[in-house]
C-alpha cells in the first residue's frame, strides 16, 4: 500500500476519520494501516453477522449502525461522539453509507459528521483507491496497489462553527476532486 499525506494527521488527540468507500476491505485495511490512531469504524449492523468477518470487526472495536432505523442510527452517532470525548480512540466513517460500485463518490449522509461536531474534534479527510481490485487480483495471483491519501485535517474550531451540511459539502468536494484527478 501507499500512504500519501500522513503528516496531515493531527499531531495529538483523536479525530473523526472519513473516507470514500470502494470495497469491503476498506475498513480493515485502514484500521490496520493506521492502527496507532486507534480508529473504531462505524459499520452497518449486517456486517457483524458475517462469519469470521463479523468476529474480526467486533474485536477491532467497530460499532454497528442500523441504517434503517434513524433513532438507533443517532444512538450510534452519540456513542461515537462519547468515544471521542471519553477515550483516546478515534472514529472512522464512510459518509457515502455504502460502497460505490462505479468507483465514483456517492452522495454523503451528512449526519455522520455530527460525531465530530458533538465531540468537538477535528475531521481527517481521506481517499482510498485500489481496494476494489483486491478480490479479482487475488484470484489471478496479482499484486494490488492500494493508495490512501490524507487530503486535509479540518480543525476542531472550524468543525464546531460550520453547519453540518456545509461541512459535508466541503469534505465531499475535497474527495471528489481528488478521485476525479486519479481517473484514467
Which residue stretches match the model-derived regions?
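Non-catalytic C-terminal accessory region of glycerolipid acyltransferases
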Residues: 74-184
Amino acid at each position: 500500500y501507499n500512504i500519501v499525506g500522513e503528516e496531515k494527521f493531527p499531531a495529538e488527540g483523536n479525530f473523526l476519520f472519513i473516507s470514500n468507500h470502494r470495497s469491503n476491505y476498506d475498513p480493515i485495511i485502514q484500521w490496520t494501516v493506521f492502527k496507532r490512531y486507534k480508529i473504531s469504524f462505524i459499520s452497518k449492523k449486517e456486517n457483524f453477522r458475517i462469519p469470521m468477518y463479523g468476529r474480526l470487526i467486533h474485536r477491532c472495536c467497530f460499532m454497528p449502525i442500523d441504517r434503517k432505523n434513524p433513532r438507533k442510527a443517532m444512538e450510534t452517532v452519540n456513542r461515537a461522539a462519547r468515544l471521542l470525548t471519553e477515550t483516546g480512540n478515534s472514529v472512522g466513517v464512510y459518509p457515502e453509507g455504502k460502497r460505490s460500485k462505479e468507483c465514483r463518490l456517492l452522495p454523503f449522509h451528512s449526519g455522520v459528521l455530527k460525531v465530530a461536531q458533538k465531540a468537538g474534534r477535528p475531521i481527517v479527510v481521506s481517499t482510498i483507491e485500489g481496494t476494489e481490485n483486491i478480490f479479482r487480483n487475488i484470484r489471478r495471483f496479482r499484486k494490488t496497489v492500494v493508495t490512501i491519501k490524507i487530503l486535509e485535517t479540518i480543525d476542531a474550531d472550524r468543525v464546531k462553527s460550520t453547519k453540518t451540511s456545509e461541512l459535508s459539502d466541503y469534505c465531499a468536494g475535497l474527495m471528489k476532486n481528488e478521485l476525479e484527478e486519479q481517473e484514467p
